[in-house]
């Protein structure tokens, strides 16, 4: 039985802490064997021991902290061919590195589908969506396709991707997000832990967009789900409402703090 992953523990592991900057390839790509050897050299026993606590399969893993993988990726730059080769190894850190090296402009819809079908943890799923997939022109089409999947991590990918687009694509129009709300509503009753948390993430992301219209639609859906007779849908709705309420309160606190500072001058 898979362990429940709290928001706090997810943030501690920090696979999705911020979008990766677009990096040109700065030197010839190493071989897959050389990249594996470098990752193995970065291994940490404590990190390896902790993977299972975050519901990440540890069989064959090296135990490399995510920060170490990111730093190595930054040194290599974009290396799409190497990323594809690393992905084919199936090894955890190799696949994490692949997510940071892959070129969103080069990855094809077929490659996206192939990667997604082989996801075996939320960490790989979210990192691919957050650092590659949301920057492709295929993103919304994949949200619609993957949301219909019965596979737990493919379905999570649909909503992790939707959440990532909501966060990163500041210029995206409202329409594709509004069109995605029925997908959220249908998936909210999926009781599987990683699916329902992905669904909540997507709903919260849409509800935090700058558009008042989107915020209104997202809050209305969250309110409707919170009143559902289905336990999973009710959890998604309540989780989203709590987070959206905090998001509304935060600017008010910031303004109040600013006013206090001004009045004390």
Label every model-predicted segment.
Residues 2-8, 18-265:
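Alpha-helical scaffold domains
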């Amino acid at each position: 039985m898979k362990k429940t992953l709290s928001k706090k523990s997810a943030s501690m592991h920090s696979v999705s802490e911020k979008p990766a900057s677009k990096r040109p390839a700065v030197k010839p790509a190493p071989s897959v064997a050389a990249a594996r050897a470098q990752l193995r050299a970065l291994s940490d026993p404590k990190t390896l021991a902790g993977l299972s606590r975050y519901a990440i399969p540890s069989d064959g893993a090296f135990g490399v902290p995510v920060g170490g993988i990111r730093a190595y990726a930054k040194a290599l730059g974009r290396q799409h061919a190497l990323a594809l080769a690393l992905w084919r190894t199936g090894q955890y850190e190799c696949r994490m590195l692949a997510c940071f090296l892959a070129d969103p402009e080069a990855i094809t819809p077929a490659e996206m589908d192939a990667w997604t079908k082989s996801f075996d943890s939320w960490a790989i799923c979210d990192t691919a969506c957050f650092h590659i997939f949301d920057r492709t022109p295929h993103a919304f089409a994949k949200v619609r396709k993957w949301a219909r999947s019965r596979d737990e991590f493919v379905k999570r990918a649909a909503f992790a991707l939707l959440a990532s687009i909501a966060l990163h694509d500041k210029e995206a129009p409202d329409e594709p997000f509004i069109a995605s709300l029925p997908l959220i509503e249908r998936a909210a009753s999926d009781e599987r832990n990683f699916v329902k948390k992905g669904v909540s993430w997507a709903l919260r992301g849409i509800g935090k967009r700058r558009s008042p219209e989107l915020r209104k639609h997202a809050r209305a859906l969250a309110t409707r789900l919170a009143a559902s007779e289905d336990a999973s849908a009710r959890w998604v709705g309540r989780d989203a409402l709590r987070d959206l309420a905090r998001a509304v309160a935060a600017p008010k606190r910031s303004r109040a703090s600013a006013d206090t500072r001004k009045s004390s001058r």
